[in-house]
């Protein structure tokens, strides 16, 4: 894939294939807000396409060559298959074809970019920074990978000089970016369908970091600590070299409080509506960015206090019969552990409902998934969400469930959506926290479960 950059062309009509995706829709919306002509296509309507259509973007449902009439540039993501009819038609017809990351990198050239990367925590950290800057009056332009209520969605065009953007490492395209500030939250083995090994992942992050003016990273991650050219650092593990640390930490069911220190000197008290240790680390990254930009700690703390969390990041969907339903995007073993640790703070019995994401990830991290659910009282596993992959590895949701069951006493596998709903309707009980985990479409059944009027039946 050619990842070179080219200048934005006046009068260009950009067509986004898969425009309803969270990353594609945000970029399309910003371009439209800049006055550029944008269209797109997707398989079916969703919240994103409805918002795009309301903004004046033409959205076609179904991928067809005729959708490209008048288009001068086609934008695609790594989720689009090579045989997509619009992609093929664009290449045959001489239409410029650009990866989403190329277009975002071009957009970034006009801003002081704050790029947030890392295996975990990108969306929450970038959203924290964006909300902080917004509440401090800096009016940033934002493109993030989740819905943020305080910003009105997953993207916005601001009038200020800053662009806050989530930088995706999954396909190697992070090397296109040269941000003013690069935040690296952590680096772990993931996306090994693209990278041969962890070393290749680290090298991609190194190239990205070397292209930044300032690199903010977490010393609690060995790969970040040992391999990133850090300018500013933060830590919750008490690393003496860290620029930003926290003590007097309190985790409750309502949120997190901590005292923040800058190079050993007390800055003040931080209060978050977010749960869990991992989110305090994300907030420290935001503090570091805010201080680099010249904000006072009082401004930073006030801005971060406003953030209620991105959608699908420990998002409370609803409650029925004293059963709380929470949706979370966690799809890597480390994310599962962190999210379950936060769930335990609620003081409820935790029932983890897990949809593995991608055959490749499930196979490569099978043993790690096996030990990731220790903080759940009960676990229900579904079939794997393919995300466009073919299953050539012989892995299945049932295999994942068996691996978890080797380390956990209460694990069930449900192969279909209907059997999963029947199981949950029969076994959830008052006082439970039903935690839906995964980056696929598992959360679609939550509204159906919330609509049940009858109280749940037998306990597990």
UniProtKB/Swiss-Prot annotation:
Keywords: ATP-binding, Cell cycle, Cell division, Cell shape, Cell wall biogenesis/degradation, Cytoplasm, Ligase, Nucleotide-binding, Peptidoglycan synthesis. GO terms for molecular function: ATP binding; UDP-N-acetylmuramate-L-alanine ligase activity. Its EC number is 6.3.2.8. Pathway: Cell wall biogenesis; peptidoglycan biosynthesis. ATP binds at residues 118-124. The keyword Methyltransferase does not apply. One of its GO terms (biological process) is cell division. It is found in: Cytoplasm. The keyword Chloroplast does not apply. One of its GO terms (cellular component) is cytoplasm. It is an enzyme of class 6 (ligase). Gene3D superfamilies: Mur ligase, C-terminal domain, Mur-like, catalytic domain, NAD(P)-binding Rossmann-like Domain. It holds the Pfam family Mur_ligase_C. It catalyses: UDP-N-acetyl-alpha-D-muramate + L-alanine + ATP = UDP-N-acetyl-alpha-D-muramoyl-L-alanine + ADP + phosphate + H(+). Cell wall formation. Belongs to the MurCDEF family. This is UDP-N-acetylmuramate--L-alanine ligase.
């Amino acid at each position: 894939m050619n990842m070179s950059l080219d200048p934005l062309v006046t009068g260009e009509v950009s067509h986004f294939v898969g425009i309803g995706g969270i990353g594609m829709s945000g970029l399309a919306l910003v371009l439209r807000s800049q006055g550029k002509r944008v269209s797109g296509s997707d398989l079916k309507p969703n919240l994103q396409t409805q918002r795009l259509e309301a903004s004046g973007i033409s959205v076609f449902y179904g991928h067809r060559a005729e959708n490209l009439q008048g288009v001068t540039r086609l934008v695609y993501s790594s989720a689009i298959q090579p045989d997509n009819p619009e992609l093929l038609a664009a290449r045959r017809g001489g239409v410029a074809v650009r990866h989403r990351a190329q277009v975002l990198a071009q957009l970034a050239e006009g801003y002081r970019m704050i790029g947030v990367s890392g295996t975990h925590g990108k969306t929450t950290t970038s959203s924290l920074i964006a909300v902080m800057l917004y509440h401090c009056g800096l009016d940033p332009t934002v493109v993030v990978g989740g819905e943020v209520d305080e910003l009105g969605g997953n993207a916005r065009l601001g009038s200020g000089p800053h662009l806050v953007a989530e930088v995706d490492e999954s396909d190697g395209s992070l090397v296109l970016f040269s941000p003013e500030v690069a935040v690296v939250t952590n680096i772990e083995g993931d996306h090994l369908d693209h990278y041969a090994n962890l070393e290749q992942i680290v090298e991609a992050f190194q190239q990205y970091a070397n292209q930044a003016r300032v690199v903010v990273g977490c010393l609690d991650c060995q790969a970040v600590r040992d391999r990133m050219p850090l300018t500013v650092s933060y830590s919750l593990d008490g690393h003496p070299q860290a620029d930003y640390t926290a003590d007097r930490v309190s985790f409750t069911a309502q949120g997190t409080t901590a005292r923040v220190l800058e190079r050993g000197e007390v800055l003040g008290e931080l209060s978050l509506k977010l749960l869990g240790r991992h989110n305090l680390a994300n907030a420290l990254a935001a503090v570091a960015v805010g201080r680099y930009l010249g904000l006072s700690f009082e401004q930073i703390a006030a801005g971060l206090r406003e953030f209620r969390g991105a959608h699908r990041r420990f998002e409370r969907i609803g409650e029925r019969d004293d059963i709380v339903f929470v949706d979370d995007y966690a799809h890597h073993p480390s994310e599962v552990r962190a999210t379950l640790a936060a769930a335990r703070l609620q003081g409820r019995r935790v029932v983890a409902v897990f949809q593995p994401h991608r055959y490749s990830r499930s196979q490569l991290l099978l043993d790690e998934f096996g030990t990731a659910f220790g903080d759940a009282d009960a676990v229900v596993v579904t079939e794997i969400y393919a995300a466009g992959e073919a299953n050539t590895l012989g892995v299945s949701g049932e295999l994942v469930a068996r691996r978890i069951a080797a380390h956990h006493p209460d694990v069930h596998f449900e192969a279909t959506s209907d059997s999963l709903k029947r199981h949950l309707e029969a076994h959830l009980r008052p006082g439970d926290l039903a935690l839906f985990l995964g980056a696929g479409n598992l959360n679609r059944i939550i509204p159906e479960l919330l609509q049940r009027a009858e109280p749940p039946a037998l306990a597990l």
